[in-house]
Amino acid sequence: MHFDHVAVRVGNIQAAVNWYRSLFEATVIYQDENWSLLSVGDTKVALVLEDSHPPHFALRVNSQEELLEPAEHRDGSLYNYIVDPWGNTVELIYYPSEKN
């Protein structure tokens, strides 16, 4: 298991992408109307609209069996959101088509 990405809420996807690109030289990995995944150095940052995804950090797991009741993202990755006792959201994510 290792760190995969952090997701932060934004009010406007394109404005946020432009800001992260200009300030941090981020590159877009994926983007649609609800969210964008950026590469910032060795880190991935997901920009999410306020009502589309919870703010969270994601841990990449090594097998589907490590997920609790997995759901499927549009890109084919499998995930599960869990909430710690203090209200923080953690995403466990597995990429079936890649080595984790």
Language model features with spans:
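Conserved short beta-strand elements that form part of the metal-binding/catalytic scaffold
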Residues: 27-61, 89-96
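Short glycine-enriched loop/turn motifs at secondary-structure junctions
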Residues: 1-2, 50-54, 74
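Core segments of cupin and vicinal oxygen chelate
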Residues: 1, 7-45
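Vicinal oxygen chelate
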Residues: 68-100
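A short, structure-level motif marking secondary-structure boundaries and short turns
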Residues: 1-3, 68-69
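Short secondary-structure junctions
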Residues: 24-30, 67-74
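Short, conserved charged micro-motifs
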Residues: 15-18, 64-69
